[in-house]
Amino acid sequence: RQAALNLNINLKLYGADMAGTAPALVYCDYTRKVCSMHDKEYIQQLIDICVADKIDVLIPTIDTDLLILSKNTEKFDKVGTKVLISKSDKILICRDKNNTGEFFESCGLKAPRTYNNYKNYPGPYPCFIKPKDGSSSTNAFKVENGEELAVYAGQISEYIIQPFVSGREFTIDIFCDFEGNPIFITPRERVQVRAGEVLKTMICMDKVMI
């Protein structure tokens, strides 16, 4: 919003939510209700909103919505709405942590080895188990021994197991244009985290990460 003011652009923000209670809606000029992303009418409801409100750009804010939106970008294009989103193959790399690990290896980056069956995990402990497509640290557990691992594995349908790695953690925000070219890159240290969400962060313009 501040950028639009600086550029003298007339900007109106619309927000959509299932319950109409999402905290971010307070920053929107107008709000709309939509069904669950799992509902077969989800995409059509969003398209109807985009048509009625003449939405220029749709910006997803929840990672669970990314794949379905990416697969339907052409439908939004037809009504004049651009979805600010990556291609489906890139989203699949990020959403499935098995694919993420394989991608890191293909780039020559170090990453903890991933296991999909607790019976095959050789150690060491502690280790970490979490859903392969999870978010917000839901059903993510630090495990101290094999007995604990078996218990947690029984509670998660599709999981990954990795050796526990401690250290400083960074997120790198990359703002790109519609062709995927980086406009600005901002590394930041996750100083304090709760339920997978950052409470306190510190920008660190490190040239190696950039």
Each PLM stretch: what is its role?
Residues R1-L84:
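ATP-binding N-terminal substructure of ATP-dependent carboxylate-amine bond-forming enzymes
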Residues K12-D17, R113-N116, C127-F128, F141-V143:
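Short, hydrophobic beta-strand segments that form beta-sheet elements in well-ordered domains
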Residues A22-C28, K119-P124, V151-Q155:
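Short loop/helix-cap segments at secondary-structure boundaries that form the rim of catalytic
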Residues L25, Y42-Q44, S86, L92-D96, ...:
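Short, charged, surface-exposed secondary-structure boundary motifs
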Residues I62, D96-K97, N145:
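Helix N-cap/beta->alpha junction signal
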Residues T81, S88-T114:
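Glycine-/Pro-rich loop/turn segments that contact NAD(P) or position catalytic residues
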Residues F104, P112-T114, Y121-N139, S157-G167, ...:
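ATP-grasp fold ATP-binding core
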Residues F141-I210:
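Phosphate-binding site of ATP-dependent enzymes
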